[in-house]
Regions:
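Short, positively charged loop/turn segments that connect secondary-structure elements
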Residues: 26-42
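A conserved regulatory-domain signal marking ACT and ACT-like small-molecule sensing domains
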Residues: 8, 12, 16-19, 37-208
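Long amphipathic alpha-helical segments
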Residues: 1-31
Length: 208
């Protein structure tokens, strides 16, 4: 349990059935103790468990949430995912150069091992389609919006800050299209129809 503190959180909020959890961890408990253990004993141990880790993590994250900086919203975005190729980097350089022509352009590039994701403002969409026309398009989505959160510098030392933020959106049944991060910024990309609710949830985190 101490290895998975977020299970403690779910237990504290009564989101996990104690009996079901006991059945799941019973084999591991028996193995550790090297003897047969009854499920009732495991349930009693879980119920007596002090949520120290969960409360400490929650307190620290809550403090960070109150210290969140500016929240910036952008709409009319497009999302493209291309297969990584030897020519792709040259094309990325072209779209980066184009995006520098105007402050109205928005562009993020995230390169993975096998694919590269590009999120752009709608006014850059024709240039992306032209520049990358010979590349292998894996997926594209339009009618998106992004919310960028300025994170306090302490976020690097606190586990669970991303979990805490994304959990709120998951509970609201908001599908996150992309998550883009730098050292002290987190950008969440959602569908246009979900941006108002997403913004409201994030502001509630700052204010409450």
């Amino acid at each position: 349990m101490r290895k998975t503190p977020f299970i403690e959180e779910a237990l504290h909020e009564k989101l996990i059935n104690v009996s079901s959890l006991a059945r799941v961890i019973l084999p591991e408990v028996s193995l550790l103790l090297k003897k047969e253990v009854k499920i009732g004993a495991v349930m009693m141990a879980i119920n007596r468990l002090s949520p120290a880790n969960e409360l400490r993590i929650r307190k620290n994250i809550k403090k960070l949430a109150l210290d969140l900086g500016d929240v910036i919203v952008r709409s009319d975005l497009c999302d493209f995912t291309f297969k990584n190729t030897t020519s792709l980097l040259k094309e990325i350089a072209k779209i980066l150069s184009k995006s520098a022509d105007s402050n109205d352009y928005f562009l993020t590039v995230s390169q993975g091992i096998f694919e590269t994701n590009i999120v752009t403002s709608k006014n850059l969409q024709p240039y992306v389609q032209e520049i990358f026309k010979k590349e292998i398009l894996i997926n594209s989505v339009v009618n998106l919006a992004s919310i960028t959160i300025k994170l306090p510098k302490e976020n690097l030392e606190q586990s669970g800050i991303y979990y805490f933020i994304l959990k709120q959106l998951a509970w609201a049944n908001i599908p996150v299209q992309e998550v883009i991060s730098t050292t002290n910024e987190m950008t969440i990309v959602v569908k246009d129809k979900d941006v108002n609710e997403t913004f409201s949830i994030l502001m509630d985190m700052k204010l409450n």
